[in-house]
Amino acid sequence: MVIYGYIRVSTREQNEVRQLNALGGWGILPENLFTDKQSGKDFERPGWLDLMGRLDRGDLLVVQSIDRLGRNYTEILEWWRYITKDRQADIVVLDMPLLDTRAKGEDLTGAF
């Protein structure tokens, strides 16, 4: 299992330090941390696409907040399903503990 982190800031002027600090305790190796400095309006972002090319079954993707993935609910949902169903990887959203797909069960945990 590889632990990946994803950070996105909307503009080059914004600072990714807050998100980097939030991911700090997860033991993410520098080569497994992907950053984009652009809008979340779509998923055509180089860091995101590179990450999706590496994510594999049993891996874990950690993000600080769901809005760091993107701004379009439908596209977030499509990518969420792709990661968890097609790639069979897990996702943890740090500021929303219910969005942790590692906890498999009958409740809403991880169901997006």
Label each region the model flagged.
Residues M1-F112:
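Short, structured surface patches at the beginning of a domain
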